[in-house]
């Protein structure tokens, strides 16, 4: 038991120890290096420390390793000079280092260990400092000239670390802060050395070991030679003595020697004295040259030269020659001279005063320059450059000159065909070999190389043959079939050149001739020079080229001329010499030449092309002009130029006189150029006066306000004489014709600034028209009190304008000003400165509203409007007074019409049918009210006829039968005629064809309601009816003095004694045939003449007008009125038996009541009026009316059908606008009679014998309204032009219903308005013909062709509006039924 307990206790204790030990070891951690050793450099024998610190649990142990081996420390060996410090650092008491043994130098690491692991530090090197004694490079002595830089260089001894360097001068350290001294590496640099810089210099190398001094070096500073007295240029005559002095100084003393033209002086002729003076006893021309005194010492050399000039007459070394150059090219005329002194060479174009000198600064626009040697070069040749150029050489000993001609040709003239430099050579090659046929060409433009074989294009599609980049033809795998002649063709826009060679392909083993080597060929000859030119020959000379393997044995000369061929031609073969004359050339032809050399190996490359040369021309035998004589005489001509006269700002007249007139003068050349307003003087412009006796010319198209230089020169062919003296003239100025450019407006200043900056550029130079003197700036507000104007000098291009008001729109304009005035203003630049300096640049184009507002606010506009209103008011008052006064005399008279067997009886000189809208009827103008109000509850559309003129009447509106409207103006009394019992007017026995009558008035739809009557008896009779009598026949005459109650909104408007009744909404009207005018003319009438006159005058009425009613007018003083209006009413023409169908429907009716101006026609008028009255009273009793009522209360009938009176010319001119305006404000209310009945006529006017009947409909049976007019075969086709088709619906009888046309009153016709068709009523005439009505419209001035419409039309009851319809049956009896 006890043993068991002991065992248990022992086990528990063991477990406790294990558990407790595990808890303690959990706090241990492996070592970690917290401080690593660093590299160190230390001197030999000096102490040093390598630091290392580590942490860990348990505390780690530290060991050191050098180059991988453990370091022995004092712990290992107490005598060791290395000690391991408690912190772990390794301390060296001294560094041991020797040549062979280096125990301390190496790479060290420290290692920290415990039972959990180890940590290794970074490597740290320990190096031993070293500095050797010997310099790798010691400085050397330096000798420099004063002012030059000096450089001393050394390399310090080897050491570690690398030693640094500094310098000592005379054992004193040099301060390198001085600007002239700099030390870079081992170099000491002293710039701009001085004498004081001379001395002994030592280089010192140092590092942590110590210092080492180099061997000393000496810096020596010398002085270059300088001249105390220089030789000077001298000019002497031949045989004179001359001396050149030369005195110098320097350190060391320099030596002096002389040279002439960079060569030593020849002995014998020159003496040099002790003071180095050069003396020439007797000068000759060969002594001329440059003599140089040379002073030299150790540090430098100085030279001074002087020129000796020996005077002698000038001579030409190279003379200028004639040249031919294409436009746009460059030409050079050589002119080399010699002389003593050297001649001054200058050039001049013959006839020009401008001289060109060598080394002269070239003008910006000049294309000519002269080289120092005297060569004249002209670039970009122009046609105007052609002429003679003179080279002149001038010295004190004399002068010489030479002349050469420049001929300018077309561009292609100087562009020869391509040149083949090397062409293919004859070759013999074996089968399966490779052939190379060379072809190298050049030219301008670069030519294209192509090949031909036996004249055909090659290689084609053969893959064995290719053309290489340089044009060489290569053929691989040769075959026997490749044998042939191959031609190389070089082609460009200037022509083509070809070169042929033979290729012979043989079997293997045959003799093979290889291609030549270029090195075996001779070199190209030099450029051929032209030595002589005749009419048909040119002599050339050249120099041989470099010889090849074999020298050249002969030469070939090739030539080209644009006028002869387009390729190079061989003109000479096997030429043995280098001088040859080419013959057989054309006269006056330009040629180019080139030469090739020949040797047994082949041809050389061509020589450079010769200059273009023109053969001489064949002078006309009769001319025999001696050029020298011509030039001499032209040189003697003296032209005196007068002061030019300015004619206009762009024209100047030039006049001159000539002292004597020589034989050889063809004319005078006026030369002028602009000299002001340009940076450089412009070129001369020419105006030739080709008449020798001419002494004046006018220069045109000149610039305004510009100064011109003018001179005059005589000429004869290409020869030109001396210029006159130059005169200057200034054209007059004008105001600038263009505004300143690039006008910009910007704001300037601070946040709340009210200033703007305006900048601009001058107007274009061509539009300045003079010298700009100032600029004017306008800053215009919307009111004059805001305007700000400024004027600035012409040199100013911007200005600041202040004091602008915020919120005001300003327009900124700028204009330039010359002495002639202010020019065109710039476009306005709108700108608005906001309340918070918000600048708003508005668009340039103001809105129409703003523009109108600006105009309306102008005082002139307001005054003009006020004056115009006053004039209109006064005119209206005068017209109103005259009109009322005149109406009082028109209200008590009547005119009646009657028709007898012979036709309509009128006043003896007028047909009975009148046009109410024609100004020829002055007393009828106010008889008819006008309306344009639409129909209530009716279908309307945009295509309805809506143009109603004076005399139009709308029907009454249903439901308003208790109201009546005034239908007539005061003074108009209407009566009607019954034609029911009369015989037919449309009998087939009497008429076979209807013809239009030029003066028949078309009845407008609304006019039927004014007088609704049946067609009358052939015998028209008149009767003065009272209103009560007419009421029995269903007529309603308006009360002329009764006011109208109507209008818009139920408002009442007074209408006292007014001819303008109020308007009322009405329906469209039916159309009823009307009685025609007489076919036979009345005695004394001239209807035909009148019709033609109306066509010629293109008469046009103001609006649509209804026909004149058959009615009577009471008129007093008719004859006076007729005389008063005689001048305004044309006399009707004489009418023939039948009207011509060609009469246009577009012509207005010419029927009027105006009598003939002849006094004898007035009694006849009164007789006709009486007859009409009696006939009418007789026929009234025979009228029969059948009225059907639908239990409706009796309604007053509409006014009778008839003809509408014309208007006075004065009324038409003054009343129309006023009446129209009033009509638009008033509505006419008209009672609607017989509302239960409507008429639907059937019309078939293709057959004039057919009947025209009416059929009654009740209001409940009314069909859709139809067109306001019935159309027949003679109706104008204008309806189809003025109205678009509307949907139709078929009814019984096959008639078509159409939508009603709503009338609208318009102020003027538009392009959409056309003629209103109307069925022509046909009436019997003694001649068996009938007259047809015509349709007319406003704006119709010419004849219109008619179109037959073969269709019956059903008329809506609303169109007829209970009117008694008039028709005719087959027997010709007219019937009416209500």
UniProtKB/Swiss-Prot annotation:
Low complexity: compositionally biased ranges: 1058-1067, 1319-1343
Name of the protein in question: Roundabout homolog 2
Membrane topology: Single-pass type I membrane protein
Gene that encodes the chain: ROBO2
Modified residues (Phosphothreonine): 1154
Positions with biased composition (Polar residues): 1141-1155, 1240-1285
Transmembrane annotation, as ranges: 860-880
Pfam families cross-referenced by the UniProt entry: fn3, I-set, Ig_3
Keywords of this entry: Chemotaxis, Chromosomal rearrangement, Developmental protein, Differentiation, Disease variant, Disulfide bond, Glycoprotein, Immunoglobulin domain, Membrane, Neurogenesis, Phosphoprotein, Receptor, Repeat, Signal, Transmembrane, Transmembrane helix
Membrane among keywords: yes
Disease involvement: Vesicoureteral reflux 2: A disease belonging to the group of congenital anomalies of the kidney and urinary tract. It is characterized by the reflux of urine from the bladder into the ureters and sometimes into the kidneys, and is a risk factor for urinary tract infections. Primary disease results from a developmental defect of the ureterovesical junction. In combination with intrarenal reflux, the resulting inflammatory reaction may result in renal injury or scarring, also called reflux nephropathy.
Domain Ig-like C2-type: 31-127, 133-220, 225-309, 314-409, 418-504
Main location: membrane
Glycosylation sites: 123, 426, 752, 782, 789, 845
One of the protein's GO biological processes: pulmonary valve morphogenesis
Species in which this protein is naturally found: Homo sapiens
Any GO CC annotation of this UniProt entry: axolemma
Topological region Cytoplasmic: 881-1378
Positions of the Fibronectin type-III domain: 524-618, 637-735, 739-836
Signal peptide: 1-21
């Amino acid at each position: 038991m006890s043993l068991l307990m002991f065992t248990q206790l022992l086990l528990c204790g063991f477990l406790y120890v294990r558990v407790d030990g595990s808890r303690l070891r959990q706090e241990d951690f492996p070592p970690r290096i917290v401080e690593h050793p660093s590299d160190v450099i230390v001197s030999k024998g000096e102490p040093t420390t390598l630091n290392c610190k580590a942490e860990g649990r348990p505390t780690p142990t530290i060991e050191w390793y050098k180059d991988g081996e453990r370091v022995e420390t004092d712990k290992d060996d107490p005598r060791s000079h290395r000690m391991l410090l408690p912190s772990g650092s390794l301390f060296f008491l001294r560094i041991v280092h020797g040549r062979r043994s280096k125990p301390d130098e190496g790479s060290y690491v420290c290692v920290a260990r415990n039972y959990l692991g180890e940590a290794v530090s970074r490597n740290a090197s320990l190096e031993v400092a070293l500095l050797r004694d010997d310099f790798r490079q010691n400085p050397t002595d330096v000798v420099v000239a004063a002012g030059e830089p000096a450089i001393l260089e050394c390399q310090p001894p080897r050491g570690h670390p690398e030693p640094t360097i500094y310098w000592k001068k005379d054992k004193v350290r040099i301060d390198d802060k001085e600007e002239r001294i700099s030390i870079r590496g081992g170099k000491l640099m002293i710039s701009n050395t001085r004498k004081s810089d001379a001395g002994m210099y030592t280089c010192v190398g140092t590092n942590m070991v110590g210092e080492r001094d180099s061997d000393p070096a000496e810096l020596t500073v010398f002085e270059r030679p300088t001249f105390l007295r220089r030789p000077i240029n001298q000019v002497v005559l031949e045989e004179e003595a001359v001396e050149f002095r030369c005195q110098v100084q320097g350190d060391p003393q320099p030596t002096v020697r002389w040279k002439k033209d960079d060569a030593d002086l020849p002995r014998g002729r020159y003496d040099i004295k002790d003071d180095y003076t050069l003396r020439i006893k007797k000068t000759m021309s060969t002594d001329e040259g440059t003599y140089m005194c040379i002073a030299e010492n150790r540090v430098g050399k100085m030279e001074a030269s002087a020129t000796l000039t020996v005077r002698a007459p000038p001579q030409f070394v190279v003379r200028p020659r004639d040249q031919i150059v294409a436009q746009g090219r460059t030409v050079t005329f050589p002119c080399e001279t010699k002389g003593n002194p050297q001649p001054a060479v200058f050039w001049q174009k013959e006839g020009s005063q401008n001289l060109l000198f060598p080394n002269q600064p070239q003008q910006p626009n000049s294309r000519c320059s002269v080289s120092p040697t005297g060569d004249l070069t002209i670039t970009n040749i122009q046609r105007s450059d052609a002429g003679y150029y003179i080279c002149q050489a001038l010295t004190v000993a004399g002068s010489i000159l030479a002349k050469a001609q420049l001929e300018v040709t077309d561009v292609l003239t100087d562009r020869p065909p391509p040149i083949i430099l090397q062409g293919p050579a004859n070759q013999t090659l074996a089968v399966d070999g490779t052939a190379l046929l060379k072809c190298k060409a050049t030219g301008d433009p670069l030519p294209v190389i192509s090949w031909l074989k036996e004249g055909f294009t090659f290689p084609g599609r053969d893959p064995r043959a290719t053309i290489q980049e340089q044009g060489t033809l290569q053929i691989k795998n040769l075959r026997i079939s490749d044998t042939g002649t191959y031609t190389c063709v070089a082609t460009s826009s200037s022509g083509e050149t070809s070169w042929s060679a033979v290729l012979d392909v043989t079997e293997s083993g045959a003799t093979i001739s290889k291609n030549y080597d270029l090195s075996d060929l001779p070199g190209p000859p030099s450029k051929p020079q032209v030595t002589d030119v005749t009419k048909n020959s040119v002599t050339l000379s050249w120099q041989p080229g470099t010889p090849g393997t074999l020298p050249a044995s002969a030469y070939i000369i090739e030539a080209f001329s644009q006028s002869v061929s387009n390729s190079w031609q061989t003109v000479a073969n096997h030429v043995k010499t280098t001088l040859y004359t080419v013959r057989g050339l054309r006269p006056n032809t330009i040629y180019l030449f080139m030469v090739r050399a020949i040797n047994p190996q082949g041809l050389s490359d061509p020589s450079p092309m010769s200059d273009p040369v023109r053969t001489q021309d064949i002078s006309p035998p009769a001319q025999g002009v001696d050029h020298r004589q011509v030039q001499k005489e032209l040189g003697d001509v003296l032209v005196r130029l007068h002061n030019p006269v300015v004619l206009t700002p762009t024209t100047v007249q030039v006049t001159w006189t000539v002292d004597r007139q020589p034989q050889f003068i063809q004319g005078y050349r006026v030369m002028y150029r602009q000299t002001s307003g340009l940076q450089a003087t412009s070129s001369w412009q020419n105006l030739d006066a080709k008449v020798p006796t001419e002494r004046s010319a006018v220069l045109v198209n000149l610039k305004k306000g510009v100064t011109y230089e003018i001179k005059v020169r005589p000429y004869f062919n290409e020869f030109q004489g001396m210029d006159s003296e130059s005169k200057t003239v200034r054209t007059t100025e004008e105001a600038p014709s263009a505004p300143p450019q690039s006008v910009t407006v910007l704001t300037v200043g601070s946040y709340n600034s009210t200033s703007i900056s305006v900048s601009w550029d001058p107007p274009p130079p061509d539009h300045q028209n003079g010298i700009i003197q100032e600029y004017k700036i306008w800053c215009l507000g919307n009111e004059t009190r805001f305007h700000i104007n400024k004027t600035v000098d012409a040199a100013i291009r911007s200005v600041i304008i202040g004091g602008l008001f915020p919120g005001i729109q300003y327009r900124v304009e700028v204009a330039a000003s010359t002495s002639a005035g202010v020019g065109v203003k710039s476009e306005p630049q709108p700108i608005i400165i906001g309340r918070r300096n918000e600048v708003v640049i508005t668009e340039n184009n103001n809105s129409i509203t703003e523009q109108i507002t600006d105009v309306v606010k102008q005082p002139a506009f307001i005054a003009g409007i006020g004056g115009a209103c006053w004039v209109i008011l006064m005119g209206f008052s005068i017209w109103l007074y005259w009109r009322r006064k005149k109406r009082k005399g028109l209200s008590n008279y009547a005119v009646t019409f009657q028709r007898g067997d012979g036709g309509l009886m009128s006043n003896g000189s007028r047909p009975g049918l009148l046009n109410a809208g024609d100004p020829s009827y002055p007393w009828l103008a106010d008889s008819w009210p006008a309306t344009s109000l639409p129909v209530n509850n009716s279908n309307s559309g945009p295509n309805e006829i809506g143009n109603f003129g004076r005399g139009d009447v709308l029907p009454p509106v249903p439901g308003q039968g208790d109201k009546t409207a005034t239908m007539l103006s005061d003074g108009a009394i209407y009566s009607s005629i019954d034609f029911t019992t009369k015989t037919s007017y449309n009998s087939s026995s009497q008429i076979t064809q209807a013809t239009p009558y030029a003066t028949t008035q078309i009845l407008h739809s609304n006019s039927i309601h004014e007088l609704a009557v049946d067609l009358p008896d052939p015998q028209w009779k008149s009767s003065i009816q009272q209103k009560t009598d007419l009421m029995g026949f269903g007529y309603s005459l308006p009360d002329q003095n009764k006011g109208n109650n109507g209008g818009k909104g139920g408002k009442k408007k007074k209408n006292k004694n007014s001819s303008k009744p109020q308007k009322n909404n009405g329906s469209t009207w039916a159309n009823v045939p009307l009685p025609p005018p007489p076919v036979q003319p009345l005695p004394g009438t001239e209807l035909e003449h009148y019709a033609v006159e109306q066509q010629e005058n293109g008469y046009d009425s103001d609006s649509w007008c209804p026909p004149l009613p058959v009615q009577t007018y009471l008129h007093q003083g008719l004859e006076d009125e007729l005389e008063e209006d005689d001048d305004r009413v044309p006399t009707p023409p004489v009418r023939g038996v039948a009207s011509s169908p060609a009469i246009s429907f577009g012509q207005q009716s010419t029927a009027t009541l105006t009598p003939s101006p002849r006094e004898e026609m007035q009694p006849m008028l009164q007789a006709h009026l009486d007859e009409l009255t009696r006939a009418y009273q007789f026929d009234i009793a025979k009228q029969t009316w059948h009225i059907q009522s639908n239990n409706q209360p009796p309604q007053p009938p509409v006014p009778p059908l008839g003809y509408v009176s014309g208007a006075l010319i004065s009324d038409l001119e003054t009343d129309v606008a006023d009446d129209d305006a009033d009509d638009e404000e008033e509505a006419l209310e008209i009672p609607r009679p017989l509302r239960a009945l409507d008429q639907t006529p059937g019309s078939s006017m293709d057959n004039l014998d057919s009947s025209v009947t009416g059929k009654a409909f009740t209001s409940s049976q009314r069909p859709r309204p139809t067109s306001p007019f019935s159309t027949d075969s003679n109706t104008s086709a204008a309806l189809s032009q003025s109205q678009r088709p509307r949907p139709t619906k078929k009814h019984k009888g096959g008639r078509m219903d159409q939508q009603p046309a709503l009338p609208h009153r318009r102020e003027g016709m538009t392009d959409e308005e056309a003629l209103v068709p109307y069925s022509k009523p046909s009436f019997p005439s003694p001649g068996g013909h009938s007259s047809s009505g015509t349709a007319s419209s406003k704006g119709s001035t010419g004849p219109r062709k008619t179109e037959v419409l073969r269709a019956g039309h059903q008329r809506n009851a609303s169109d007829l509006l209970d009117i008694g319809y008039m028709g005719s049956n087959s027997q010709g009896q007219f019937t009416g039924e209500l």
